[in-house]
């Protein structure tokens, strides 16, 4: 008998049918994969399961009992825990307080912090997570925060655990800890719904698989061993994708961006590099290698200690992002939710926010011009939405990334694009569309810096790769010399290479 059952679950929003009569079952003690393009309905299904949103129709059964909860709290008490891609921790509370939030150990109404911290410390050590429980969550890396979310599910003894892109911010070591935790939960009899775009992980961890497309059930595989990667990709996108990367050779111009001796608070060893007109330069390294820190220094988001930056031979001193933008340099940040999109605002507003000075006269906005621009970029970038007025938080990760790119494409005179983790949490179909946008920009002479923790991505789309390790430049590899083993070796922490490029 199935332990978890979705029966004709449907959910609609204004102009969009997110789920249409989705039905499938999952056995007890099974890791079940959930795949589909961004916008396929995966996140909506998880929200319905978690009680965050109510279904318009259909039923959910756990161990034969219909679930009629109407809130996240009800689902929580039913043994359902969801770990979202957008983490739900409270930044200003400690690790221990977050893990015990809503169920603090108390006596006579008094919370015993010492007991709280020591209990959490023992549990974290038991499951192999090396984090001080008295540390505030705000001081932790994204990867460490993800591990704390996962630890919460383990401590709650949940019956059903949904993990949404759980390794997107984890190092290799942290991912291995996660995989061992999943094995422990599986052995305990829990159902794990594993949402991921990483086929390697799906085939390694999952026993069965469901594929959604356009809110409908595209395929259900009770035994994942009986399917293939090619079949799954075809089921996801409804078409064959022979080459996701599609690298395109193009003529490169003179140096457009030159960086000499750049350093800052979290990038102690000065680094130097250049990017030519039309070139796509990749930065690869493990988590903590200093890639994102370099990008923030370059863009003026963080104060630099020293260093020279020139664009088309003109010296630029980006001590804040406004200066960088004025000089023609823009950044698509690593964390789309907190640093990229403006939550609670429409797609139109998010596209126009950096260029509104072009759509105003004497400080008065021109709504029709702004709306026309939004419609143009929604069509050009193939943003899937019923309306430009839709709140951007309701878009999938891939469509949010397109809107951020649209924002900068609307900025006149863009010369340098720095894009950090361009396709994190984005499905294979949307990845291909993002790469098309980057190739088009490069063909127009824009110098592009791509920062990615996915080696196949930088090898697939970049003309050159700079490998970073512990805040230093460890290697500079031209496309004819791309070799996965040598690039990974250069990224390992026991290397000490540094210098100019």
Swiss-Prot record:
This is Arabinose import ATP-binding protein AraG. The lineage of its organism: Bacteria, Pseudomonadati, Pseudomonadota, Alphaproteobacteria, Hyphomicrobiales. The keyword Iron does not apply. It is an enzyme of class 7 (translocase). The gene is araG. The complex is composed of two ATP-binding proteins (AraG), two transmembrane proteins (AraH) and a solute-binding protein (AraF). It is a peripheral membrane protein. Its main location: membrane. PROSITE patterns: ABC_TRANSPORTER_1 (PS00211), ABC_TRANSPORTER_2 (PS50893), ARAG (PS51268). Residues 4-239, 252-495 form the ABC transporter domain. PANTHER family: ARABINOSE IMPORT ATP-BINDING PROTEIN ARAG, CARBOHYDRATE TRANSPORT ATP-BINDING PROTEIN MG119-RELATED. Part of the ABC transporter complex AraFGH involved in arabinose import. Responsible for energy coupling to the transport system.
